[in-house]
Amino acid sequence: MEAYKKHTSIAALMNRSNVDTDQIIPTQFLKKVERTGFGIHLFHDWRFLADNVTPNPEFELNKPVFKGAKILVTGDNFGCGSSREHAPWAIADYGFNTVISTSFADIFYTNCFKNALLPIRVSKDELAALMAEISANEGVKFTVDLEAEKLTTPGGIVIHIEVDPFRKESLLGGLDDIAWTLKHEDKITAFEEKQKQTLPWLWK
């Protein structure tokens, strides 16, 4: 998993609430278990017209000014609906590494941290201020400093990022569950060797 670093990036505005996982990545694209290749299908039903090929000019993220954005600013209750890890996979594969909302579905929120994606919870007033700044200056860049737990904007907004210390360390170190386990490989091996002596029948 790629380590999360301090960055200053374009903040893309998608002012929609209750965006569920089926809207993030429709079910017809859940046909593989690799984490890559889902970005092209992100928000598919909104991004493309009925022919499934032509970009929808009315969809927010299709604006050229948001090209290359790493920060997604969106409405309340993001990531609700059925549980599917493909949702954060698609968001990360598209190029985002940060999602800002007032609230996230619990399972989606947890899955973000396992996929190098930082979900930032803000108050309704803070979200309104961020959205207003983007609307007034589309293409504006925000700075996210996870180590300092701070989000800043050119307009003077400063927001404290509330994040669990373990999850923060995982993102900064690029450590998913497997990587955390491998950090204790020596202890695991020692335990196994001891168990082979005390409970040999388990290893037959």
Swiss-Prot record:
One of its GO terms (cellular component) is 3-isopropylmalate dehydratase complex. InterPro entries: 3-IsopropMal_deHydase_ssu, Aconitase/3IPM_dehydase_swvl, AconitaseA/IPMdHydase_ssu_swvl, IPMI_Swivel, LeuD. It is an enzyme of class 4 (lyase). Pathway: Amino-acid biosynthesis; L-leucine biosynthesis; L-leucine from 3-methyl-2-oxobutanoate: step 2/4. GO terms for molecular function: 3-isopropylmalate dehydratase activity. Pfam families: Aconitase_C. It comes from the Bacteria. It catalyses: (2R,3S)-3-isopropylmalate = (2S)-2-isopropylmalate. Its EC number is 4.2.1.33. Keywords: Amino-acid biosynthesis, Branched-chain amino acid biosynthesis, Leucine biosynthesis, Lyase. One of its GO terms (biological process) is L-leucine biosynthetic process. PANTHER family: 3-ISOPROPYLMALATE DEHYDRATASE SMALL SUBUNIT, 3-ISOPROPYLMALATE DEHYDRATASE SMALL SUBUNIT 2-RELATED-RELATED. Belongs to the LeuD family. LeuD type 1 subfamily. Heterodimer of LeuC and LeuD. Catalyzes the isomerization between 2-isopropylmalate and 3-isopropylmalate, via the formation of 2-isopropylmaleate. This is 3-isopropylmalate dehydratase small subunit. It comes from Psychromonas ingrahamii (strain DSM 17664 / CCUG 51855 / 37). The lineage of its organism: Bacteria, Pseudomonadati, Pseudomonadota, Gammaproteobacteria, Alteromonadales.
